């Protein structure tokens, strides 16, 4: 496709030392859910290894005796299970007095404490099991309504690994490699210096340091930076390649990456009742547009789909207009209390302007 606008504004931080560029690497937060998790499940669906109607326990046997085990995975992707939205996993490491529990965290790396949170904070290497246990035991808010929840996406890496016989990171990494991407990855400090990566937040409640080059989401950090709910880093251009492949019916540079029928299935409205319209993993336009409830443009077609991210990221694809809109920011810098992106509705206004540039 042709780029309508490709602009970069501002600096990595308020000291104005490093300008933002098209090569700046961002923590894309919940865009991970569609750009890694859903993407991987689509590939497995293509390969007849992943089945939407199968229950969660079909893929993860440890959930067999839980109240989540019989729920079809399709319902998790549609966010229609009623399971709670999230669990503050970082708080599970603390006692009631706010102090860290013994045998949970250490200020030094060792074989036992090998999950890197900061250079002076390491998590017990098997704590992922505790995260899974919390998900198994957590409650449902309302089983009769759609409630956005990120908890299933913590489980996607294990599902992908079991089905593909590869680690989640390697499996989705192979998809990125087939698209010639090299800045779309987890734990980017393994490959890039900090000055290529935009920092997110100055954490003053858990990791007690600037979060820079490691995932902002606390739960994903506790999964060693590789999770299905958050953890992916990328650039606007590389995200554009992924979603242009969607608009190209699964093709990239003449190579078939996905079946067009799979793209159509996952991005169409699979749950369209009342005020809830959802694709498989993807957000869809609401039946009635509301500036207070919608990040996407009022001009978006019913065929459009996308997702937003907590750190100030957004992707929206509109097949009717052959349009991809990608917005990356570090809106949580220096603190997540920074709400100006929402207050001024910046993402949506830019999206409107883009549509207006060719709809006139």
Predicted features along the sequence, with ranges:
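Short, conserved catalytic-motif segment at the N-terminal edge
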Residues: 1-28, 49-51, 210, 217, ...
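Structured C-terminal helix/loop/strand segments within mature extracytoplasmic catalytic/sensor domains
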Residues: 307-360
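Residue-level preference for non-acidic, small/hydrophobic
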Residues: 1, 33, 37, 41, ...
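Short, surface-exposed loop or secondary-structure junction motifs
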Residues: 68-302
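Short active-site loop at a secondary-structure junction
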Residues: 15-76, 138-152, 227-230
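Active-site-proximal beta-strand/loop segments in catalytic clefts of secreted hydrolases
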Residues: 1, 9, 79-81, 283-285, ...
């Amino acid at each position: 496709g042709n780029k309508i606008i490709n602009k970069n504004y501002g600096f990595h931080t308020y000291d104005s030392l490093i300008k933002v560029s098209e090569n700046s690497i961002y923590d894309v937060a919940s865009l991970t859910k569609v750009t890694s998790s859903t993407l991987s499940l689509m590939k497995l669906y293509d390969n007849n290894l992943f089945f939407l109607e199968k229950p969660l326990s079909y893929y993860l046997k440890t959930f067999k005796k839980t109240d989540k085990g019989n729920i079809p995975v399709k319902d998790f992707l549609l966010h229609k299970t009623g399971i709670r939205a999230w669990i503050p996993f970082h708080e599970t490491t603390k006692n009631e007095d706010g102090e860290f529990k013994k045998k949970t965290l250490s200020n030094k790396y060792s074989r036992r404490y090998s999950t890197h949170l900061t250079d002076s904070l390491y998590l017990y290497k098997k704590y992922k099991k505790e995260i899974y246990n919390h998900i198994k035991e957590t409650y449902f808010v309302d089983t009769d309504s759609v409630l956005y929840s990120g908890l299933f996406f913590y489980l996607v890496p294990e599902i992908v690994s079991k089905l593909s016989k590869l680690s989640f990171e390697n499996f989705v990494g192979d998809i990125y490699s087939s698209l010639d991407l090299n800045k779309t990855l987890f734990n980017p400090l393994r490959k890039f210096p900090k000055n290529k990566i935009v920092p997110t937040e100055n954490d003053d409640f858990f990791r007690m340091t600037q979060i820079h080059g490691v995932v902002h989401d606390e739960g994903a950090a506790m999964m060693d930076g590789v999770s299905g709910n958050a953890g992916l880093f990328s650039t606007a251009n590389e995200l554009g390649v992924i979603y242009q492949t969607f608009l190209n019916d699964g093709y990239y540079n003449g190579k078939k990456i996905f079946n067009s029928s799979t793209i159509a299935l996952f991005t169409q409205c699979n749950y369209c009742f009342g005020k809830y319209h959802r694709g498989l993993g993807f957000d869809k336009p609401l039946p009635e547009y509301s500036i207070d409830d919608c990040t996407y443009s009022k001009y978006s077609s019913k065929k459009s789909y996308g997702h937003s991210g907590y750190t100030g990221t957004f992707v929206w694809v509109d097949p009717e207009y052959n349009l991809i809109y990608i917005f990356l920011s570090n809106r949580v810098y220096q603190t997540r209390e920074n709400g100006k992106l929402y207050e001024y509705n910046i993402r949506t206004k830019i999206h409107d302007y883009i549509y207006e540039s060719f709809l006139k």
